[in-house]
Amino acid sequence: IAAFYQCSFIQAIELTRDANESIGSSSISLRKHAVDSSIPSDPPPLVTEAQHFLYNLPPLHQAGFEGQGIRIGVADGGFYNADSLPALPQEHWLGYADFTDEKNDIFGTKGKHGAMCLTAIMAKSDSYQGAATKADYFLFRTEEPDTESPKEIDNWVAAIEMADSLGLHIVSTSLGYTTFDTEVFNFSYADMNGRNSRGAQAAIIAARKGLLLIVAAGNDGNKTWHYISTPADADSILTVGAVDIFGEIAGFSSFGPSADGRVKPEVCAVGFQTVLVDPSNGKLINSNGTSFACPLVAGMAACLWSALPNATNMEIRERIIRSADRY
């Protein structure tokens, strides 16, 4: 914490809870507990460069590669107010689909988690630079607002199928599953092998078809279940953990390896005090969660793919993995 006070762009730090205090129940999804805190702030212009600098994104932006020609899907819960937020220019919207029981209410009052993730990658204003502001976006609502059931995995699989049909390049997924309202459906760590869940199976098929899937690792690193969730366990995708702007791992970031011994997460990005746009009022905030690290990597992948338009999804994935400081 002391190191943060030395940063000129941080005006104040306020601890919202004791470090040992439990946050929520592990039985809820990543969507519901991805945000550990939301602390209003007023960062100086382009403070987002600090979180982009960690993986050397500014040179791509400076070279003119900001996601042009890349189509990105964002699969999540609600996208509250995203359709009227000035920082999210609608000229880069391809459309949206709602796979939940509520149908076509993705911009309604139930849930802003998806909108917050979207701002990390898409938003642009005088004081904010998303990771890939010139890419085009399609939104998928797959999370039921009031229940936790395997149906949500089926919703996500349907969204990935649509993403393939639409010719998208990348899908950013800030959700994950381990336990459900009905315990008989719960996963064990042994299930996190990239083969057992329908979500992991669909992710592998999508990768074979050319999609690059970016998935949040989960926020259970400091809980009894401290492993990744699914579909983050899938092979041939990029699972993203959370660090601070200095590269130090966030305590809540879920651990690997997968149950069959593969390295997970493959990469990390800034998910501690990530600068975002609050969809409720358009102000800048700082929030925590691998949910917010995930779209940053998706945006970086889009910019890299803009620079290397003939690359395959697996080539982009491999370049990103090789860029990691612990590769």
Can you describe what each PLM-predicted range is?
Residues 1, 19-21, 77-81, 99, ...:
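Solvent-exposed loop/turn segments at secondary-structure junctions
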Residues 1-52, 58-61, 235:
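Autoinhibitory propeptides
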Residues 2, 6, 58, 115-119, ...:
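Solvent-exposed, polar/charged alpha-helical surfaces in well-ordered, non-transmembrane soluble domains
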Residues 5-9, 122-126, 161-168, 204-208, ...:
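Sec-exported extracytoplasmic/periplasmic mature domains
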Residues 59-152, 166-169, 182, 208-210, ...:
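Subtilisin-like serine protease catalytic core
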Residues 61, 124, 139-233, 259-262, ...:
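Substrate-binding/access-modulating region of protease and related hydrolase catalytic domains
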Residues 86-94, 245-292:
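Catalytic-core environment of secreted peptidases
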Residues 140-144, 227, 271-327:
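Hydrolase catalytic cores
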